[in-house]
Amino acid sequence: VPVLALLGVVGDVVRRGSFRVTAGALYAISALLILLVGTVAAAVGSFPTFETAGTIFDLGVSHAVVLASLVASLGGIHWWSTKIGRQQANEAMGRVAPLLLLVGSLAVVLADVISGLFGEGAELNADWTGGMEAMNWVAVLGTAIVALGLLTSLGAVLPALKAGTDVPADPWEGQTLEWLAPSPPPLGNFEAELAPVTSAEPLADLRQEK
C-alpha cells in the first residue's frame, strides 16, 4: 500500500505539470518501480498455490528491496551533491545511471522470482534441482548491468569532490529551505533574514510572491 501511495503522488505531480525529468527524478522512479516489482512478487508468493518456501524466489524479493534502497540512496547523493561537495554532479551521466540500474535490477529480481516459481532451491539449500538455467544467465547479465550502473553513478558524482567555484544555491528549483542556503553555506546557513515559513514549500511561496 505505501508503494502504491508513493506512485500515486508521482502520478499526481506529473498530472499537474510540475514534473521535471532530472537525474534525481529518474533515480526515484527507478527505485519505486523496483520496489513495486518486489512487492507484487511477495504478494504472489504468499498464495499457497505457489510453493516458494525454500526456493530462490524469496531471495529475488530480498534483492528487490536491497536494490531499490541502493538506487534511492544514490539518487539522494546525486540530488544533494551541491550540498555535499563543491560541484554539481554530472547530470548526463546521472540520467543514464538509474536506467542501467533499473534494467539490471529487474533482470536480477525477475530471474530469481521466475526460477523460484519453477523450484530452484535457495543458495544455502543443498537441493539445486528444478529452476530454469536460462534465468540464471539472465541474473548474471543483470548483475553485470547493475555493476555498470553503479560505476556510472559514482562517475556522475565525482565532480562534487573537486574544488571549484561556488555553485548555485538552488540548481533544481527546490521547495524546501536547504535550497535557499548558498553552497558552501555561510555562518548561520543563510545570507539574509528568512521570511516567515507558512507552508511545507517555503521556496515555492517565495517564487509566487515574486
Feature map (PLM): residue ranges:
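Juxtamembrane membrane-water interface segments that cap and precede transmembrane helices
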Residues: 53-56
